[in-house]
Swiss-Prot record:
Enzymatic reactions: 1-(5-phospho-beta-D-ribosyl)-5'-AMP + H2O = 1-(5-phospho-beta-D-ribosyl)-5-[(5-phospho-beta-D-ribosylamino)methylideneamino]imidazole-4-carboxamide
Origin organism lineage: Bacteria, Pseudomonadati, Pseudomonadota, Alphaproteobacteria, Hyphomonadales
Residues involved in Zn(2+) binding: C91, C107, C114
Name listed for the protein in its UniProt record: Phosphoribosyl-AMP cyclohydrolase
Location(s), subcellular: Cytoplasm
Length: 131
């Protein structure tokens, strides 16, 4: 059971002052982590209701690992933590933006960002180095 009220219909969802996340059919919501200082997009992950609630309560980015089927506190094992500075939802509340203070690399490859490859003319080029 989710700790959040259900989403509203139509434009009422766009204008409500209440947090009413719209989780998908798997109970998940997209979560984008962005560096609060630079604005760089760091990663895309997923949250279920429990992960979102824990993030709100603790100020530490907590995600849902689809591969492990378990909660994942960013940096719990790697030390590469995300302190949440600001938390936002998009217009219809089906995506979350976490503005974070990142310690260490955000990517499991030890890069600052998971978005370290640029597509140019259908070819990938690397933009970031692993630590």
């Amino acid at each position: 059971m989710t700790p959040f009220p259900p989403p509203l219909s139509g434009s009422a969802q766009d204008e409500t002052p209440e947090l009413r996340p719209r989780f998908d059919e798997n109970g998940l919501i997209a979560a984008i982590a962005q560096d609060a200082g630079t604005g760089e997009v760091l990663m895309l992950a997923w949250m279920n209701a429990e992960a979102l609630q824990k993030t709100i309560e603790t100020g530490r980015a907590t995600y849902w690992s689809r591969s492990r089927g378990a909660l994942w506190v960013k940096g719990e094992t790697s030390g590469h933590t995300q302190e949440v500075i600001e938390l936002r939802v998009d217009c219809d509340q089906d995506a979350v933006l976490l503005k974070v203070r990142q310690t260490g690399g955000a990517c499991h490859t030890h890069r600052e960002s998971c978005f370290y490859r640029r597509i140019e003319g259908g070819v990938l080029s690397f933009t970031g180095k692993a630590d």
